[in-house]
Amino acid sequence: LPRDEKRLLPAAPCCPNCGGSLSYLGEDTAEQLELMRSAFRVIRTVREKHACTQCDAIVQAPAPSRPIERGIAGPGLLARVLTSKYAEHTPLYRQSEIYGRQGVELSRSLLSGWVDACCRLLSPLEEALHGYVMTDGKLHADDTPVQVLLP
């Protein structure tokens, strides 16, 4: 898969403890799978480590936040999985097959775990929306059925 690399450097070019100069010590890397315009890309984040030449302090940029802690899915890919499942009514087994044809093997259980994690992340929004909807005296709903094909 193609890879994009983002380099994160420490905020200051000098040691935050003593003000001494920093020397390159190494780096930590983390990869995240992302879906961009229906094409998968791996976003590789490299966080360089620097050591102070005077006090041996190690300085490194903080890791960027992820929607799912230590997960490989980026926000665009998670949005695509949820949109396919809930707006386009594409079951997870079919999504798994589609992604497999694009060269990325994502099991149904992995996709299901992502959906569960996203539901937990979105629960405060759901609660706020529920509270807002229930403030009115009337509630209207569309009961148009959606046909689902059996697998």
What are these regions (language model features)?
Residues 1-72, 140-141, 147:
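Short, flexible loop/hinge motifs at secondary-structure junctions
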Residues 56-58, 67-71, 76, 103-116:
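Helical catalytic core of nucleic-acid polymerases
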Residues 4-7, 41, 70, 84, ...:
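Generic alpha-helical structural element
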Residues 74-88:
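Short, amphipathic alpha-helical "recognition" segments used to contact nucleic acids or chromatin
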Residues 64, 82-84, 96:
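Conserved catalytic alpha/beta cores of large enzymes that bind or transform nucleotide phosphates
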Residues 9-12, 16-19, 88, 93-151:
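Gly/Pro-rich turn-and-neighbor structural signature
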Residues 31-35, 61, 75-79, 98, ...:
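General secondary-structure edge motif
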